[in-house]
Amino acid sequence: MGILFTRIWRLFNHQEHKVIIVGLDNAGKTTILYQFSMNEVVHTSPTIGSNVEEIVINNTRFLMWDIGGQESLRSSWNTYYTNTEFVIVVVDSTDRERISVTREELYKMLAHEDLRKAGLLIFANKQDVKGCMTVAEISQFLKLTSIKDHQWHIQACCALTGEGLCQGLEWMMSRLKIR
């Protein structure tokens, strides 16, 4: 009886899960958002403020907020943290010069009270570019193994082709099932 109730509940439970997509400017956040929502590449320009789209996967609704990553906008990221269940950090795998800035912003976010229960998905974007940092290198630079208070996953991807994006969403879905 309990299994039947659970299955029926899942059919009609239309709870929305808030996701924020952050990262430095030109990392590919908006391209990823529109790959999720339209399954295609759209021409983007730097995001001033945010873009928001609802993504539905197997009756699970995600409200995804893509937040601008320019230096002048990063201080406002915390205004989006309330009720966030997942943080997607998009890393430009070709940008070795700013990986330390990404690490600094990541740990600022993780220290915020409103994100204490949020899961963390890191997309290592632009993996199609020769000479880019590998997932292992990015993991090491970001010191991901030191993160103990958040469930996290790093996923190689290419926003332009969509490669790797579904695996990231599958990880998020698996985290929801555990709760």
Swiss-Prot record:
Coiled coil start-end: none
GO BP field: intracellular protein transport; protein localization to Golgi membrane; vesicle-mediated transport
Binding residues annotated for GTP, in chain numbering: 23-30, 66-70, 125-128, 159
SMART domains documented for this protein: ARF, SAR
Positions where lipid (N-myristoyl glycine) attaches: G2
Keyword Hydrolase listed: no
Family indicated by similarity: Belongs to the small GTPase superfamily. Arf family.
Protein's name in the database: ADP-ribosylation factor-like protein 5A
Alphabetized InterPro entries for the sequence: P-loop_NTPase, Small_GTP-bd, Small_GTPase_ARF, Small_GTPase_ARF/SAR
SUPFAM superfamilies registered for this protein in UniProt: P-loop containing nucleoside triphosphate hydrolases
GO molecular function annotations of the record: GTP binding; GTPase activity
One cellular component (GO) term of this entry: trans-Golgi network
PROSITE patterns assigned: ARF
Reported function: Lacks ADP-ribosylation enhancing activity.
Alphabetical keyword list: GTP-binding, Lipoprotein, Myristate, Nucleotide-binding
